[in-house]
């Protein structure tokens, strides 16, 4: 979700009660990742949820971790940062992670919140990481979006 025109919503803690949530976070860009993780964990705490945090080396590893965790969790959230460099590596990583996470969600039926920042500069990532002075909190948004999706599917009987 983009900051401009983003919907305003908050999941209902009573409806979210008992959801098993996993947060998978890459380790690159420590300060930014700390902000994303804190935002996702705060959103979970606001809902009375205690997510399991799994750390993986990099953003590419988020996909396999999400696939395995989707076997036993109701909601999975992936968090990472990919900053554009001078080589096509950025494009390969962003495409593979986006496709992989989407495939995990569609194949398993488990909502996977996408909190992977794909940015041109580290400052753009900091602006979205929920750090002091940030304009956005993509960690919180990713967790809330995944929880809201799971709740909508349950209401629909899916």
UniProtKB/Swiss-Prot annotation:
Function recorded in the entry: Catalyzes the formation of 6,7-dimethyl-8-ribityllumazine by condensation of 5-amino-6-(D-ribitylamino)uracil with 3,4-dihydroxy-2-butanone 4-phosphate. This is the penultimate step in the biosynthesis of riboflavin.
Protein EC: 2.5.1.78
Pathway: Cofactor biosynthesis; riboflavin biosynthesis; riboflavin from 2-hydroxy-3-oxobutyl phosphate and 5-amino-6-(D-ribitylamino)uracil: step 1/2
UniProt: (2S)-2-hydroxy-3-oxobutyl phosphate binding residues: 86-87, 128
Gene Ontology CC terms: cytosol; riboflavin synthase complex
UniProt keywords, alphabetically: Riboflavin biosynthesis, Transferase
Protein name: 6,7-dimethyl-8-ribityllumazine synthase
Reaction catalysis annotation: (2S)-2-hydroxy-3-oxobutyl phosphate + 5-amino-6-(D-ribitylamino)uracil = 6,7-dimethyl-8-(1-D-ribityl)lumazine + phosphate + 2 H2O + H(+)
HAMAP family reported for this sequence: Lumazine_synth (MF_00178)
Domain of life: Bacteria
GO BP, sorted A to Z: riboflavin biosynthetic process
UniProt-listed NCBIfam families: lumazine-synth
Residues holding 5-amino-6-(D-ribitylamino)uracil: 28, 59-61, 81-83, 114
Enzyme class: transferase
Family (UniProt): Belongs to the DMRL synthase family.
